[in-house]
Amino acid sequence: MKTEEIIKSIEAEYLKSDLPIIHVGDTIRVGVRIVEGDKERIQPYEGIVIAKRHGGINETITVRKVFQGVGVERVFLLHSPRVASIKIIRRGKVRRAKLYYLRDRVGKATRVQERFDRPL
């Protein structure tokens, strides 16, 4: 076996199978596991997916939201054990693979048109 095949077979054990199909422009809610002392809780983080990178076990998404007038972006490793759940709230209609231009927009200009032809 080639080295690539060996790596893919090892990574396949750690891939999550219950992830929804996520597209750039979608509004999603990510449940993030937070450990405080000996307690563990799930903190929701809701925002628009502005970028998707890589594939396989290294797949990441960048989620942006505006909190108290300040734009906050977080990068999530999709197959990480810290990501408890991902729920799609609404589908977005965009023509770009990366929505970095939303960083420069303010107020209603940051809205993304909703798409109805893809199921949630």
UniProtKB/Swiss-Prot annotation:
What pairs make up the disulfide bonds? none
| Keywords assigned by UniProt, alphabetized | Ribonucleoprotein, Ribosomal protein
InterPro entries membership: Ribosomal_bL19 (IPR001857), Ribosomal_bL19_CS (IPR018257), Ribosomal_bL19_sf (IPR038657), Translation_prot_SH3-like_sf (IPR008991)
Alphabetical GO CC annotations of the entry are: cytosolic large ribosomal subunit
Q: Name one GO biological process term.
A: translation
GO terms, molecular function: structural constituent of ribosome
Q: Which Gene3D superfamilies match?
A: 2.30.30.790
Q: Does the keyword DNA-binding apply?
A: no
Pfam families of this UniProt entry? Ribosomal_L19
What does it do? This protein is located at the 30S-50S ribosomal subunit interface and may play a role in the structure and function of the aminoacyl-tRNA binding site.
* PANTHER family per the UniProt record, alphabetical: LARGE RIBOSOMAL SUBUNIT PROTEIN BL19M, RIBOSOMAL PROTEIN L19
Q: Which NCBIfam families match?
A: rplS_bact
Family the UniProt entry places it in: Belongs to the bacterial ribosomal protein bL19 family.
Protein name as annotated: Large ribosomal subunit protein bL19
* Organism lineage string: Bacteria, Bacillati, Cyanobacteriota, Cyanophyceae, Oscillatoriophycideae
